Curated annotation (Swiss-Prot):
GO biological process, alphabetically ordered: 'de novo' CTP biosynthetic process; UDP biosynthetic process
Protein's UniProt keywords contain Manganese: no
Annotated protein name in UniProt: Uridylate kinase
GO molecular function: ATP binding; UMP kinase activity
Class in the EC hierarchy, top level: transferase
Gene this chain is encoded by: pyrH
One GO cellular component, as annotated: cytosol
Length: 239
């Protein structure tokens, strides 16, 4: 019997907003649900981390000086809970079993994060959506994604974004930007390479956890990647 794969998919909050740039676009929720459903159909265990940038970012909230960075980050954590509940609804409407687990206790809305409980949910075929970041300010949701992936013993992290993968410089600004299909953890931490923040990449490196960056709007892309086709994405791993 083939061993079941376990993955953690990281979605940016901005992606949920679509062309609006703010809030949650129902059509994108439906698309995400259909993509995740294909993974579950193929006996893949799925955890999800979602950002909160479509509602508020802690760094941005603190820029004016009125709101402290810690308070801004707390607001950002709450934004991820809003997004997690939205994704839960979309997944459940598609026929999947889902649990939201928050790093901050809020029993009226969702479970509190417990590593072993999350693992049991995954083993039973439920999708687990991890909300409220790490529960601590100054840590990004990218770092949350790596941390939760390590804790649940995921085979890889897939960062589903609005671009095809990683370039040596910003392709929107430079026509000669080169697409990087494979790169090392150390290369991913270079200033001109924007994969994740250094804390997230260092944690992935320490645990030999592959990071795949792909276009979330490419239909069937997530399943292809997990099945071994990384031709349309970038992968960060040991050389």
């Amino acid at each position: 019997m083939q061993e079941r794969k376990r993955v953690l998919v990281k979605f940016s909050g901005e992606a949920l907003a679509g062309e609006n740039g703010f809030g949650i676009e129902n059509s994108i929720l439906k698309f995400i649900a259909s993509e995740i459903k294909e993974l579950i159909k193929n006996q893949i265990e799925v955890g999800i981390v979602i950002g909160g940038g479509n509602i508020i970012r802690g760094v941005s909230a603190a820029k004016g000086g009125l709101i402290k960075r810690t308070s801004g980050d707390h607001m950002g954590m709450l934004a991820t809970v809003i997004n997690a509940i939205a994704i839960q609804e979309a997944l459940e409407r598609s026929g999947l079993e889902v649990r939201v687990q928050s790093a901050i206790q809020m029993e009226a809305f969702c479970e509190t994060y417990i590593m072993r409980r999350a693992q049991r949910h995954l083993e039973k075929g439920r999708v687990v959506v991890f909300a409220a970041g790490t529960g601590n300010p100054y840590f990004t949701t990218d770092t949350t994604a790596i941390l939760r992936a390590v804790e649940i013993d995921a085979d890889m992290v897939i960062k589903a974004t609005k671009v095809n993968g990683v370039y040596d410089k910003d392709p929107k600004q430079f026509d000669d930007a080169v697409f990087l299909n494979t790169l090392s953890y150390d290369e991913a931490m270079q200033d001109n390479i924007k994969v994740m923040d250094d804390t997230a990449i260092a944690l992935a490196k320490d645990n030999k956890l592959p990071i795949v960056v792909c276009n979330m709007f490419e239909e069937g892309n997530l399943l292809k990647i997990i099945q071994g086709d990384t031709s349309l994405c970038s992968i960060v791993k040991n050389n």
